[in-house]
Amino acid sequence: MSHPPLPPQSERRALAIAQAVYEAFEDYHARFSEITARAKQRFETRDWSGAREDAVARIALYDQYIAECMLRLRAVLLGQAHDRALWMRARDHYAALLSGLIDQELYKTFYNTLTRRYFGTHGVDADIEFIALDIEPTDAITVPVARHTYAVSPGRLTDMLVRVLGDYAFAVPYTHRTRCAAAIAVRLLDDLAHWGEHPVRSVELLETVFYRERRAYLVGRVFGEHRFSPCVIALINDEAGLRAEAVLTRRSDVAQLFSNSRSYFQADLSTVGDAVVFLRSLLTHKPVDELYTMLGRAKQGKTERYRTFFSHFQAHPSEQLVHADGTPGMVMVVFTLPSYPLVFKLIRDRFAYPKTMSRAQVEGKYELVFQLDRIGRLLDAQPYRFLRFPKARFSPALLQELQTSCAMSLSEDGDDVLIALCYVQRRLRPLNLYLREQLPEAAHAAALDYGQAIKDMARNNIFPGDMLLKNFGITRHQRAVFYDYDELCLITECNFRDWPVPTTYEEQMAAEPWFHVGPRDVFPERFALFMGLPASQLEAVKHQHPELFDPRWWRDLQSRLREDDYPDTPPYAESRRLA
């Protein structure tokens, strides 16, 4: 909806605001692309440390360019930063500048971020923000994303794949391109044999290569006569050279590759919305917000998550927000809408003993997670500020606890409750509940994967701090994921010690340590006491992952990490690797 024109001088100022914001986003986008484009060279030169630095730098870009834009606007606003009529007209001019753009939603989110900084918006402000809770923006995108398409003649699949690898060339050669192509062909034919004779009729792959950690991915689809499946070819460049390492055709495997418990891809896409539309065809159950986020557009992911949640929230007016299942936390109050798979986490005003950290330290831990390689074991946690909920939508028990335990984060505005800061995560089944609910075989597998999760995190310089089962959840693909970050720290910051051997009867019977324990001291031999696993599952974890309880393993790993020697953690099962 357009607003009436302003007097000529104000109208010119509104147009200047729109142009300045548009140019600021263009500058941000160019810098984002510049960093992302470096991923190819990082992969070719095996510069994994540089790749990690780029990932952190790219996340920080958004707020940097918002701050820079606000500085630019000072000369335009001339003291009228809070003139609502001026911003309403600026929004109209800005919308006109975006006409026809595939990624106009990204531009709108940038604009909204600015107005919220200027006006301190609580909830949403439909007069000056771009708000569309009732539409799915990607539905309007009909332009196909850039891709390569390859037809396959009967018996010529390997030849076609040789051509594919040639089209995706790098500064380093494939160690044996034909052998790689043949291995990919064998895997495709094995995976798709149930499609009948000549199962692979064509393959299409996005022109843009996806990079993350130590791998490059060719992402696309494989078509049979009557159906299609995802097709992701994973490339690795290590001491043995550049080669294809895995092929993923199962949606569950590809979904895990795009899981929101992993770090964001580096994919230098000229436009993003059309790529999201394509990826949705591969991962039909993956929410749009997670796809934007996994492509590095975390702010747009937050916008889409807000849009879809509140659209659902408004469509279910009789459903109340309630405490999430699981053991109540000492640091957070966690609530959910039962029919929607998100949780909202608020920091308590005071923490129960033995928690000793401050509120600022907790916020710092959640910020730290964005800077880490999350390797499929740390759940994305997005901060939201000044969310507005009708007070009547909270269950009485939840509202009472929020008012008494989270007063610093809570305020009331008429019939609404405003939440100054909360962290929003995908809702998972807490591991302690899952183990009680499942049959022995499934519980055994989950316990072993819990041990593997701790090991995977450790190999990427992440120590969970609190290993209790309640701090882990199980995804729909039966993976153990850590989601409670108030005690998380880096492996390189810890002091892994042997548990001293008692020398007297009093020491042997002491309920507390009889020796000095520093704030960073960790005793792996005692982990079993703090995991909370039933005896049979604990023994299975000890048998499968004995190194977790060995201080020497942790110290050796710590030495490697301090030398920037990070062990490789593949994002798929060993069975998916090529012969």
Curated annotation (Swiss-Prot):
InterPro entries in the cross-refs: AceK_kinase, AceK_regulatory, Isocitrate_DH_AceK
Location of the protein in the cell: Cytoplasm
UniProtKB keywords: ATP-binding, Cytoplasm, Glyoxylate bypass, Hydrolase, Kinase, Nucleotide-binding, Protein phosphatase, Serine/threonine-protein kinase, Transferase, Tricarboxylic acid cycle
Highest taxon in the source lineage: Bacteria
Record: active site: 380
Reaction equations catalysed: L-seryl-[isocitrate dehydrogenase] + ATP = O-phospho-L-seryl-[isocitrate dehydrogenase] + ADP + H(+)
GO molecular function: [isocitrate dehydrogenase (NADP+)] kinase activity; AMP binding; ATP binding; phosphoprotein phosphatase activity; protein serine/threonine kinase activity
Signal peptide span: none
Pfam families according to UniProt: AceK_kinase, AceK_regulatory
Annotated ATP binding sites: 324-330, 345
Principal subcellular localisation of the protein: cytoplasm
One GO location term (cellular component): cytoplasm
Enzyme Commission code(s) on record: 2.7.11.5, 3.1.3.-
GO biological process, one term: tricarboxylic acid cycle
PANTHER family registered for this protein in UniProt: ISOCITRATE DEHYDROGENASE KINASE_PHOSPHATASE (PTHR39559:SF1), PTHR39559
Function statement: Bifunctional enzyme which can phosphorylate or dephosphorylate isocitrate dehydrogenase (IDH) on a specific serine residue. This is a regulatory mechanism which enables bacteria to bypass the Krebs cycle via the glyoxylate shunt in response to the source of carbon. When bacteria are grown on glucose, IDH is fully active and unphosphorylated, but when grown on acetate or ethanol, the activity of IDH declines drastically concomitant with its phosphorylation.
Family: Belongs to the AceK family.
The protein's name in its UniProt record: Isocitrate dehydrogenase kinase/phosphatase
Organism expressing this protein natively: Xanthomonas euvesicatoria pv. vesicatoria (strain 85-10)
Gene this chain is encoded by: aceK
